UniProtKB/Swiss-Prot annotation:
Example of a GO cellular component annotation carried by this entry: cytosol
Coiled coil (UniProt feature): none
Keyword Ribosomal protein carried by entry: no
UniProt GO BP: nucleobase-containing small molecule interconversion; pyrimidine nucleotide metabolic process
Species per Swiss-Prot/TrEMBL record: Pseudomonas paraeruginosa (strain DSM 24068 / PA7)
Protein name as catalogued: Cytidylate kinase
Compartments (UniProt record): Cytoplasm
InterPro entries, per database record: Cytidylate_kin (IPR003136), Cytidylate_kinase_dom (IPR011994), P-loop_NTPase (IPR027417)
Keyword Transferase among UniProt keywords: yes
Binding site for ATP: G12, P13, S14, G15, A16, G17, K18, G19, T20
Length: 229
């Protein structure tokens, strides 16, 4: 881990807007981008495509070691483009089914260990914006700036509903709310790297904030670090 390279760690629950915010910040700062949650989605997606059972730790660990992925910051609702083995998979890994699979494989210690060094390798000059569930607590505990971005479960369900409806999906908002609550409980209760703010993280509740307001708030904290924004 290159501690000399500046970085911003953004953690928080599903649907809090971490990916969009991280992508916009990476573009603004001109830094590298890491979407930790997408790595688990990518692994779950690849596992299904390769016929690997999502409970098979050894097979998943081997598959994780060969994931060829790039995150390209973009100025849109995703905040990024995700390239897996040369193919863009930004949208196809964002289904609720893949998300559930990602949460399932993320609970496996061997899988988390396999992806840990991969994630740390993203910390290269001129800097890194990393978002996930344990960036500030496990992956980059020495990050100089840590943000824990959250929002109410109801607001996160509303945002996800509007996002899916805009894509023409037939979704039920109450079902999305239930899924988010279940995922929150699973992620916060898991034995390995449970979802929680780092002791030195700045808590940011975006329930009544626009994406632009969230970005500007974090930029203010970046300025306080003396970073060129």
């Amino acid at each position: 881990m290159n501690a000399a390279v500046p970085m911003l760690a953004i953690d928080g629950p599903s649907g809090a807007g971490k990916g969009t915010v991280a992508g916009l910040l990476a573009r603004r700062l001109g830094w590298n981008l890491l979407d930790s949650g997408a790595l688990y989605r990518l692994l779950a997606f690849a596992a299904v495509n390769h016929g690997v059972d999502l409970t098979n730790e050894e097979a998943l660990k081997l598959l994780a070691a060969h994931l060829d992925v790039q995150f390209v910051a973009a100025d849109d609702s995703h905040g990024q483009r995700i390239i897996l083995e040369g193919e863009e998979v930004t949208d196809v890994i964002r289904t609720e089914q893949v998300g559930a699979g990602a949460s399932q494989v993320a609970a496996l210690p061997a899988v988390r260990d396999a992806l840990l060094q991969r994630q740390r390798a993203f910390r290269e000059a001129p800097g890194l914006v990393a978002d996930g569930r344990d960036m500030g607590t496990v992956v980059f505990p020495d990050a100089p700036l840590k943000i824990f971005l959250t929002a109410s479960a109801e607001e996160r369900a509303r945002r996800r509903y509007l996002q899916l409806k805009a894509k023409g999906a037939d979704v039920d908002q109450s079902a999305l709310l239930e899924e988010i609550r279940e995922r929150d409980e699973r992620d916060s209760q898991r034995a390995v790297a449970p979802l929680k703010p780092a002791d030195d993280a700045i808590l940011l509740d975006s329930t009544e904030m626009s994406i632009e307001a969230v970005v500007e708030t974090i930029i203010h904290h970046c300025e306080q670090q003396g970073w060129d924004v």
